[in-house]
Amino acid sequence: MLPCHMRSSFSMSLLYHAYVYLEFLILACTIYILAPGVYTDKIKWGIHEIDVRPDGNGFWGQRIRQNNPRVDGYELKINPQNESYYLPHPEGGYVQFENMINSTVQDGKLVMQQKSFYHVNDMPDFAKNKVLEEARRQIDAAGAADYKVEWLVSDESAVNQLTEFFKEHNVDIIVTFYPE
C-alpha cells in the first residue's frame, strides 16, 4: 500500500487525466454531431442527389449554392454552417429549409426589388397561389415532423403583407423580419 501523501497525489493525477480524457470525448462527440460535411446517407431532392446525415425528423445536408451572390450570402447568413435542413414530405420527396432551430424550420426570403413575389398584395392571383402552394408544402412536411415553419424575410413591407396573407388563408407560418 502507498503512503498517505503518495496516495492523494496519485489519486489527483488519475482524476486529472480522467477529466482531460472525458473533456476530449465530449469535444470529439460534439464535433462529430455538429460538423458539417460528415454525411452518412444520400437523398434525392428534385434533380439533385444530396449527401446528408440524419438529425431529428429530417436531415442536415449539402446546401445547393445559389447563382445570385446576394441570395447565396443571405442563405449563409441564416446558416453559416453552409448546410440545408431537409424534411421528408408525406406525399414523397423532400422539402429544403435554410436552417432548423428548436423544432422550427427556417426558410429565407430575400426581397431584392420592390416588385417582389413576396409583396403579395401587389401580385396577381396566380402568383399568390404559388406562394400559398409553397407555404402549404412546407407546412405539410413540418407538420408531419411536429415542427413549426418560420420564413425569414428581408423586407419589412413583405413581412407585413405575408403575415396578413397567411392569416387570411389560415397558413400557420411565422414571418419574421431578417435584414440582408
Predicted segments, located by residue:
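Short, solvent-exposed coil/turn elements at secondary-structure transition points
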Residues: 15, 111, 179-180
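Glycine-rich short-loop/terminal segments
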Residues: 27-124
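Generic serine detector
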Residues: 8-13, 24, 84, 103, ...
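Hydrophobic, gly/ala-rich membrane-insertion helices/peptides used by toxins and envelope proteins
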Residues: 1-44
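Residue-level marker of positions within ordered structural domains that often coincide
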Residues: 1, 104, 143
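Active-site or metal-binding loop neighborhoods of secreted/extracellular toxin and effector enzymes
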Residues: 26-38, 42-49, 57-64, 68, ...
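Generic hydrophobic secondary-structure signal
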Residues: 4, 78, 91, 97-100, ...
